[in-house]
Amino acid sequence: MTDLAAKPGIRTVFIVSDGTGITAETFSHSILAQFEMKFRQVRIPFVDTVDKAHVAVSKINEAFHVEGMKPIVFTTLVDAEANRIVHQARATILDMFQTFIEPLERELGLKSSHAIGRFHQNADTEAYKNRIEAINFSLAHDDGQSHKNLAEADVILVGVSRSGKTPTSLYLAMQYGVKSANYPLIPDDFERGKLPTVLYEYKSKIFGLTIDPQRLSEIRNERRPGSKYAALENCRYEVNEAETLMRRESIKWLSSTHKSIEEIATTILQDIKMERDAY
């Protein structure tokens, strides 16, 4: 099948898991980022039966035959038989459980639970409910939409439009269960030289994001090409005014220009001294 073929010079990577595959995919991103080449990732989740394992092997082998190169396969499969079947694929297999769990079993003198999906909470756990609550809160308080219940916020992000506030807020909620609100800093705020009035009561929760004006202009031009909103001169003005305002108000801030969402979120958690386990 042609849709299984990667472009020349691009290696195909399969993520095979008996759960969502998010854990293996995150790990694979960290590993593959060490190599200066492009990869095409294909996730095969919920491989929790022998039949599904055979289907996964068929897809992997097809990619091998089409491309003439062994695919790279990251696996997190608890079921021994399903794992054995996948290991028969024409591929380079990187078995995360075999790599880490077996040495730990020997060191701890204990057998692991071998429970499928143990890492992620079930829908009826308290942690899962807290995470959903945080996501709903962050969505309701995105881009200054609502002033209600701001006292419940763990953090309030401020910055000019398109500086990374929304994705960071949602990442904090989804990954750490953090209730994050975010507010845009706009020309009216710059003219007054003050934060939005509603935020002063919660100033201790505020963290700022800024961004390089050139990069901001590029991002805004994707949304509103040729507009004053996206013009480089306007972006320079807004960024300068926002940074001046944050300095005046003694608000801690960082530049999102060259940082990933994960790096931004980790910095914020450290700053507000919140210790949260990732879900």
From Swiss-Prot:
MF GO annotations: ADP binding; ATP binding; phosphotransferase activity, phosphate group as acceptor; protein serine/threonine kinase activity
UniProt name for this protein: Putative phosphoenolpyruvate synthase regulatory protein
Taxonomic lineage from the root: Bacteria, Pseudomonadati, Pseudomonadota, Betaproteobacteria, Burkholderiales
Family per similarity comment: Belongs to the pyruvate, phosphate/water dikinase regulatory protein family. PSRP subfamily.
Reactions catalysed: [pyruvate, water dikinase] + ADP = [pyruvate, water dikinase]-phosphate + AMP + H(+); [pyruvate, water dikinase]-phosphate + phosphate + H(+) = [pyruvate, water dikinase] + diphosphate
EC number: 2.7.11.33, 2.7.4.28
Binding site for ADP: 159-166
Keywords of the record: Kinase, Nucleotide-binding, Serine/threonine-protein kinase, Transferase
Function: Bifunctional serine/threonine kinase and phosphorylase involved in the regulation of the phosphoenolpyruvate synthase (PEPS) by catalyzing its phosphorylation/dephosphorylation.
Pfam families with a match to the protein in the record: Kinase-PPPase
